[in-house]
Amino acid sequence: MQSQYSHIVLGLGATGLSVVRYLCGKGITPLVMDSRRQPPGAETLASSFPEVKLIAGGFDCRYLVQATQIIISPGIAMNTPEVRAALDMGIEVIGDVELFAREIADRKPCVIGITGSNGKTTVTTLVGEMLREAGIAVAVGGNIGIPALDLLKENADIFVLELSSFQLETTHSLNCVASTCLNVTEDHMDRYSDMDAYRKAKLRLYHQSRSIIFNRDDALTIPTEPMNQNSFGLAPPEGDEWGICDSKIYHGHSEIMPITEVSLIGSHNHANLLAAMALVYAVGVDKQVMANVARTFTGLSHRCEVVGVKGGVTYVNDSKATNVGATVAALDGLSDHLGDIILIAGGDGKGADFSPLEEPLTKVTHLITLGRDGNKIAALKEGAIKVDSMAAAVAKAAQLATSGDIVLLSPACASLDMYSNFMARGDDFRSQVEQLDGE
């Protein structure tokens, strides 16, 4: 055993590799540990950084307690016993986003930060598109796509970061020009002791921002103390707020565009659009530019994505709805639809309370459930249909639906009980829809 490694990277994968790449670029050779016996990225580490040692299958406290700094991947909880032991000894434990923040500390604020239980990726992508349309050099990543440290290679004037609660736990000095917490609904209760702990992790972002944008329709996003703040919401705006009045988007008294010209479907996505507009306004983007992007941006895969129309029935893939709040938002967003809604839900509930689904399920004509916790969701609606596969779910939905109806896959659960990830689940749904008869 080497007597000491000053820097230890806990957790490999894309984030861990980005940390190794960054540290080696600084002339620091870290030690990497991962609890998995065959962590993703191990082959890349061995070929690209042969000088970096990997300990797989667990965390070795003998190394941890001698480190100067531990960089922890967001998937590893801070209360992991080995991490707790290092913290108790006063060893600094931070995440990759904190390393990123320290690297750009001498620059004027150049980060737009986006967190929330749902809608983060849509808003992050929208903000990036609006900045590009405005001619601003932008780099987009964080919790999606490219890890924050890898964005440093890009010649960007603005960094747009999607940030999870896990990442924010270990981030302290991210100097954002603007940030938002889009919403706070129950999620990751297998990691947090209660909703308050989860909310506090999210709202850590506010204290690292020059300007904050909160959701006035969600009280849990409101700052706990006065800040330089503004809000967005679906109701008519007051003062300088962002909102909707007479089916038009407004900033204060300034009309931006009719909501009928927006390509995104669902009121929850209209709220996402308002948040994106408020964020880019903070860095000087023209409102006409915002409107241009809103007219052409149709959304992301697996997020209320229309994957087919068969026999007049619209099939919508919302596989990214991995928690209850996301499915509630999807159902609320489609509540103005005139036809019936047939919902396919279920999967790994991650210890969630499903009771908030009970009222939104009254808007659903038929409920089809599958997966580990499908029975818990089925118990919320009389006449729910239980199946054991996506093929069976789509076939049953197609049998029940008539022209003008929507079949919505919005699971309210994670996918890992049946699939490798939510994308694979959504792809299966799409594949089953494509195999249906009818145009």
Curated annotation (Swiss-Prot):
Locate the transmembrane regions by residue number: none
Single GO molecular function: UDP-N-acetylmuramoylalanine-D-glutamate ligase activity
What keywords does the record list, in alphabetical order? ATP-binding, Cell cycle, Cell division, Cell shape, Cell wall biogenesis/degradation, Cytoplasm, Ligase, Nucleotide-binding, Peptidoglycan synthesis
Can you tell me which residues bind ATP? G116, S117, N118, G119, K120, T121, T122
Its recorded reaction(s) are: UDP-N-acetyl-alpha-D-muramoyl-L-alanine + D-glutamate + ATP = UDP-N-acetyl-alpha-D-muramoyl-L-alanyl-D-glutamate + ADP + phosphate + H(+)
* Any one Gene Ontology cellular component term annotated for this protein: cytoplasm
Q: Using the UniProt record, name the top-level EC class of this enzyme in a single word.
A: ligase
Q: Which PANTHER family match?
A: UDP-N-ACETYLMURAMOYLALANINE--D-GLUTAMATE LIGASE (PTHR43692:SF1)
Family membership? Belongs to the MurCDEF family.
Q: What is this protein called?
A: UDP-N-acetylmuramoylalanine--D-glutamate ligase
Q: What is the lineage of its organism?
A: Bacteria, Pseudomonadati, Pseudomonadota, Gammaproteobacteria, Alteromonadales
